[in-house]
Regions:
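Short amphipathic alpha-helices and their capping/turn segments at secondary-structure boundaries
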Residues: 1-5
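Extracellular glycoside hydrolase catalytic/binding regions
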Residues: 6, 10, 19-170, 176, ...
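Aromatic- and carboxylate-lined catalytic core of secreted/periplasmic carbohydrate-active enzymes
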Residues: 168-203
Length: 203
């Protein structure tokens, strides 16, 4: 892939995997999936047996191996990985500790879905991901917080985030405006607000 994309101006970065994790204990042979979500399943585990090794060191070795392969073909494009938002000390982002990843990646990226009842969790995630490397919130969407307060959250934290990418379901606001469901109205509200966000968080 890196060989084919190395000279393309369309390639901004390589995201090594979507929401990878290092399991805390051995998993069954072939059990690479984390479980179905919305009808989809995808590979997230990067090993099936940690064999007593520190999870963060397994993640570091995995990133280094992929980075070395990519850099042998493409010295230009950036490299990152989309982190699961996790701040429990025993998990530390499921092995992908931001402090460790900042030493290996060109920028950090995290997926963030703040909860209305516990906004402090999302704030803690951003704090944990604040390192010497730029931070991009690679996914955000009002799944558990209404569009208006979530937009306030984004504006409040623009100073510590280099870029924000909203999860996008493929329907533009114009199409959603003709919808009849609450979900369509909610998504329309969010996308309209999102389009205006550059006035407050634009660089």
């Amino acid at each position: 892939m890196a060989r084919a994309a190395a000279h393309s101006p369309a390639v901004f970065c390589y995201n090594l995997r979507n929401e990878p994790f290092v399991p805390g204990q051995a998993r069954a042979p072939g059990d690479w999936l984390a479980g179905e979500l919305g009808g989809f399943s995808y590979v997230q585990a990067i090993t099936l047996d940690p064999a007593g090794r520190p999870r963060s060191e397994i993640a570091r070795a995995w990133v280094r191996r992929l980075r070395t392969v990519i850099r042998s073909e493409d010295a230009r494009a950036l490299i990152t990985v989309g982190l699961l938002p996790e701040t429990r000390p025993t998990d530390s982002f499921f092995g992908f500790d931001p402090a460790v990843m900042a030493e290996e990646l060109d920028f950090l990226s995290v997926h963030l879905y703040p909860r209305a009842q516990k906004p402090e969790e999302a704030r803690a995630v951003l704090q944990a991901c604040t390192t010497a490397k730029p931070l991009v919130v690679e996914e955000i969407f009002p799944l558990a917080m209404a569009p208006a307060p979530l937009m306030t959250f984004v504006r409040t934290h623009c100073h510590r985030v280099a870029g924000w990418l909203s999860f996008y379901w493929g329907q533009p606001p114009e199409e959603l405006a003709r919808g009849t469901t609450q979900a369509e109205a909610w998504t329309h509200d969010w996308l309209v607000r999102w389009q205006l966000l550059s006035r407050d968080c634009g660089r």
